[in-house]
Regions:
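P-loop (Walker A) phosphate-binding loop of NTP-binding proteins
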Residues: 10
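ATP-dependent small-molecule kinase phosphotransfer cores
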Residues: 35-94, 109, 121-123
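ATP-binding Walker
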Residues: 13
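Walker A/P-loop
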Residues: 16
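A glycine- and Lys/Arg-enriched "phosphate-lid" helix/loop adjacent to the NTP-binding pocket
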Residues: 97-144
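Hydrophobic anchor at the beta1->P-loop junction of P-loop NTPases
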Residues: 7
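NTP-dependent small-molecule kinase module
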Residues: 2, 25, 129, 143-175
Length: 175
């Protein structure tokens, strides 16, 4: 049976970068769910939110997640930050045969620094004007989302780890 590794975490937590490095290291296919959606839809996530709204996005996000899960190959899937929090996506993730879900836990301060210069390219935070507003938004959002993120099989605090160290730690945890 083919193995699936789900990377879960808040936007800016490094899921895509870590997923690429991990998949290369263990010779698995890598899929970034947001990139998979934009490739198949032919427009960016921002454009989907603007033109078709969030409800449409969450519907197709679930459909594309199912499509990736059903690919018959060993794979690492980097999820969108909100993916586990909508519909019964977290149940789907946890009930996927031969899978591991990994929450890449980052501090609020790390996320603020990482996201502040990318605000305009992130639909959920594009309206924020200052680091203080961003910090408050992330704090509230994480409080809401942690009930989903913390259901992951593996929780890895990545705050003080370099990329290479995160990948090595994940390989150890995955056996």
């Amino acid at each position: 049976m083919k193995k699936t590794i789900f990377l879960i975490g808040y936007m800016g937590s490094g899921k895509s970068v870590i997923g690429k490095k991990l998949s290369n290291s263990i010779l698995y296919s890598f899929y970034d769910l947001d990139n998979f959606i934009t490739t198949n839809e032919g427009i960016t996530i921002n454009e989907i939110f603007e033109q078709k709204k969030e409800l449409y996005f969450r519907k197709i996000e679930r459909e594309y997640l199912n499509e990736l899960i059903n690919k018959d190959e060993h794979k690492v899937i980097s999820l969108g930050g909100g993916t586990p929090c909508y519909s019964d996506n977290m149940d789907l993730i946890l009930n996927t045969s031969n899978s591991d879900s990994i929450y890449l836990n980052r501090s609020i301060d790390f996320l603020v620094e990482r996201l502040y210069n990318k605000i305009s390219s992130r639909p959920l935070i594009a309206h924020l004007k200052s680091k203080e507003e961003l910090k408050e938004f992330i704090s509230k959002h994480l409080f809401e989302r942690n009930q989903y993120y913390l259901r992951s099989k593996i929780i890895l605090n990545t705050n003080n780890l370099e990329l290479h160290d995160v990948v090595e730690e994940l390989k150890k945890l995955l056996g």
